[in-house]
C-alpha cells in the first residue's frame, strides 16, 4: 500500500527482535534479523516483520525500522507492562524490590525518533533506546516523587519463579494483566548495552533522563498534570 501510494513507511519493531551477544558488548543495529534464534513468539514475530520491511526496502519501498527498548512515559491509557508495574508500586504492592532491570526509553522521545525517521533514506535500522535502569532505581525514584520511604529489601529474581503459576492463575481469575511472567523475568535478568549513537547522529535522537520519565509516568498514573 505504501509503495503504491509512494508513501514513507517506518516500522516500529522492538529490541526484543535482536539477538543479544553472549558477552557484555554493545548492541548495535543489525543488517538483518534472525527470528530462529529468539526464544519468544513476540521477538520472532517482530524479527520476521522487520526482515520483510528491509526486503521491501531493497525492492524500492521507502521504509525504515526502529527498535525501541522498554517504553515508559505518560499517556499509557491501555496500561502496558511497565505502567502496571509502576501502578502496583504506587498502590503499595509490592513492599519490596527485586533485582534486575532493563533499558527504558521515554515514549515522547520514541515518537520524536519515529517522526525523524520519516525523513531519512529508506533501508535504515535505528535503535531508539534510553539507558539501563534497575528495578530498585525506578522504585526509589517513585518513592522520592511520592514522599514514601524507599524499599529496603530487594529480592533475587530467582525467588519469583516458583510463584509464577499462582500469579498467572490470579490474573486469569480476576481477568487482570499481571506484570510478572517467565519472559518478563528473563528480560529483567539480562543487562543489555544498547548503542543508540546512530539514531543520535542521524535522527537527532536525545533521550531524556530516566528520572524525568519515571516522575512524569507517576504523575500521569496519579492523575496529575504532566509537561509535554
Give short role names for the model-derived ranges:
Residues 113-178, 196, 210, 214-228:
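Mid/C-terminal beta-alpha module of Rossmann-like enzyme folds, strongest
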Residues 17-19, 61-82:
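Flexible, glycine-rich beta-alpha linker
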Residues 20, 37-67:
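Active-site Tyr-X1-5-Lys
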Residues 33-37, 84-105, 109:
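A conserved pocket-lining segment of Rossmann-fold NAD(P)-dependent short-chain dehydrogenase/reductase
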Residues 94-98, 104-109, 157-202:
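A hydrophobic C-terminal alpha-helical subdomain
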Residues 48, 79-81, 98-118, 124:
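Substrate-positioning beta->alpha
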Residues 1-40:
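Conserved Rossmann-fold NAD(P)-dependent oxidoreductase catalytic core, especially the SDR/UDP-sugar
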Amino acid at each position: 500500500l505504501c509503495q503504491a501510494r509512494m508513501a514513507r513507511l517506518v516500522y516500529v519493531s522492538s529490541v526484543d527482535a535482536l539477538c543479544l551477544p553472549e558477552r557484555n558488548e554493545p548492541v548495535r543495529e543489525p543488517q538483518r534479523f534472525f527470528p530462529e534464534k529468539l526464544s519468544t513468539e513476540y521477538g520472532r514475530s517482530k524479527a520476521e516483520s522487520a526482515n520483510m520491511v528491509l526486503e521491501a526496502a531493497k525492492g524500492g519501498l521507502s521504509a525504515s525500522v526502529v527498535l525501541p527498548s522498554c517504553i515508559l512515559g505518560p499517556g499509557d491509557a491501555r496500561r502496558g507492562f511497565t505502567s502496571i508495574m509502576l501502578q502496583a508500586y504506587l498502590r503499595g504492592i509490592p513492599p519490596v524490590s527485586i533485582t534486575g532491570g532493563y533499558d527504558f526509553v521515554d515514549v515522547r522521545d520514541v515518537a520524536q525518533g519515529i517522526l525523524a525517521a520519516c525523513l531519512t533514506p529508506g533501508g535504515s535500522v535505528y535503535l531508539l533506546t534510553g539507558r539501563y535502569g534497575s528495578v530498585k532505581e525506578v522504585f526509589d525514584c517513585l518513592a522520592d516523587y511520592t514522599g514514601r520511604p524507599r524499599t529496603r529489601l530487594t529480592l533475587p529474581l530467582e525467588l519469583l519463579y516458583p510463584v509464577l503459576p499462582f500469579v498467572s492463575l490470579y490474573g486469569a481469575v480476576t481477568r487482570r494483566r499481571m506484570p510478572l511472567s517467565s519472559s518478563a523475568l528473563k528480560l529483567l535478568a539480562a543487562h543489555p548495552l544498547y548503542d543508540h549513537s546512530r539514531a543520535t547522529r542521524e535522527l537527532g535522537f536525545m533521550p531524556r533522563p530516566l528520572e524525568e520519565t519515571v516522575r512524569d509516568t507517576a504523575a500521569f498514573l496519579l492523575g496529575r498534570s504532566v509537561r509535554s
